[in-house]
Amino acid sequence: MASQGTKRSYEQMETDGERQNATEIRASVGKMIDGIGRFYIQMCTELKLSDYEGRLIQNSLTVERMVLSAFDERRNRYLEEHPSAGKDPKKTGGPIYKRVGGRWMRELVLYDKEEIRRIWRQANNGDDATRGLTHMMIWHSNLNDTTYQRTRALVRTGMDPRMCSLMQGSTLPRRSGAAGAAVKGIGTMVMELIRMIKRGINDRNFWRGENGRKTRIAYERMCNILKGKFQTAAQRAMMDQVRESRNPGNAEIEDLIFSARSALILRGSVAHKSCLPACVYGPAVSSGYDFEKEGYSLVGIDPFKLLQNSQVYSLIRPNENPAHKSQLVWMACHSAAFEDLRLLSFIRGTKVSPRGKLSTRGVQIASNENMDNMESSTLELRSRYWAIRTRSGGNTNQQRASAGQISVQPTFSVQRNLPFEKSTVMAAFTGNTEGRTSDMRAEIIRMMEGAKPEEVSFRGRGVFELSDEKATNPIVPSFDMSNEGSYFFGDNAEEYDN
């Protein structure tokens, strides 16, 4: 990517950005992981969880959600000001699952947010440790990306549901900072901007007054974040147009949707990080592993090694397939919801199937679900190889892809060609090239027309044996190109509902 030199690496975003060398970054990320681990150990003690119960991913999710809620300033303020019946704004909680008399029972716990904040700060040497909180948000976001297809949200903003490969991070809260912005897909940014513009169209005062000035600053910042993700001059110029508009309206929405479509072929740069559940970090810390001393990276071998040696369990509903549940969580752990399934199968060493073929619902259990027939099983989160996570979209080229998802967003920096359905994508670009962005549109369409199927992305990059910690011997995988490469293929995954 051309501008790589001017950007901060995401470890720097993760660490408040003073330019640090690799060792300092690894130590700093390690410190963040230590804090999450220590917090989780303490919460398991508070909740009186057995070792097995502490390694249950559903319990991990509840504990993570409690601390995120405890630190959600804006929502907490809102709840104080708009009290709703039966909800104590000062408390947070959720379902905790325990093994009682040979079966799983659900217990609803409630804690003071103040108490949770105290435990979190204590585990993080007195700091608020916002980076650790963001890390958990990204893990939840990656899990949502793998579990749900955002068809409805896409359609509501006037986008095509087949653009789901652009929607990474679409459920990340606004407060997720620079690290959160780095992992958001092109479609996610476009959707946030369209929502904003629509509010401006419907509400005369949206851009006016002191609040409007803040809104305008946020709008321009989001435009700049999106611009920074595009890799071609024409796409960036188009973002300048959208940003500089005096009174953003339908023309800007058109331009944004156009640029999102173009990203199916001219892919943007989106960061990928392996963020694991707290119940992985906790046991590692309690076994005496010192992440800060050893150093840790979210984009290298470390998360793979950690998962090789972790035991994580999950509740399984009566007609779910534990192997499928494992695949769902494995993909979430590596931020790989929109990666090519053929590459994922190669790295994982077992076949990775499209979402619609998986007999599993989401990981979280709803409060009205019956616990009587719940079983639990071990999640298989190990891998055959490891690969470096990418923050670039790779070169852009074409190959047969599917009806449901018509492009991929690469997660791993591994040589291959990136599939997309060129005829389908290009069909959306008939006609409309008039207006003030016509020259950019023409240029973008020309580049898309020129994208070639035989072009290889990430040339020379490969996967590595797990024993090859220094990444010295890349293994370039070979694929059966006739196979289906998209995860949300003609899909019936559940919708994500807030």
From Swiss-Prot:
Motif Unconventional nuclear localization signal positions after renumbering to this chain: 1-18
Name of the gene: NP
Keyword RNA-binding appears in the UniProt entry: yes
Cited function: Encapsidates the negative strand viral RNA, protecting it from nucleases. The encapsidated genomic RNA is termed the ribonucleoprotein (RNP) and serves as template for transcription and replication. The RNP needs to be localized in the host nucleus to start an infectious cycle, but is too large to diffuse through the nuclear pore complex. NP comprises at least 2 nuclear localization signals that are responsible for the active RNP import into the nucleus through cellular importin alpha/beta pathway.
Biological process annotations from GO: symbiont entry into host cell; viral penetration into host nucleus
Name used for this protein in its record: Nucleoprotein
PTM summary: Late in virus-infected cells, may be cleaved from a 56-kDa protein to a 53-kDa protein by a cellular caspase. This cleavage might be a marker for the onset of apoptosis in infected cells or have a specific function in virus host interaction.
Phylogenetic placement of the source organism: Viruses, Riboviria, Orthornavirae, Negarnaviricota, Polyploviricotina
Stretches with biased composition (Basic and acidic residues): 8-21
Localization, UniProt: Virion; Host nucleus
GO CC annotation terms, alphabetical: helical viral capsid; host cell; host cell nucleus; ribonucleoprotein complex; viral nucleocapsid
Superkingdom of the organism of origin: Viruses
Key words of the record: Capsid protein, Helical capsid protein, Host nucleus, Host-virus interaction, Ribonucleoprotein, RNA-binding, Viral nucleoprotein, Viral penetration into host nucleus, Virion, Virus entry into host cell
Motif placement: Bipartite nuclear localization signal: 198-216
Renumbered residue ranges of the record's region Disordered: 1-21
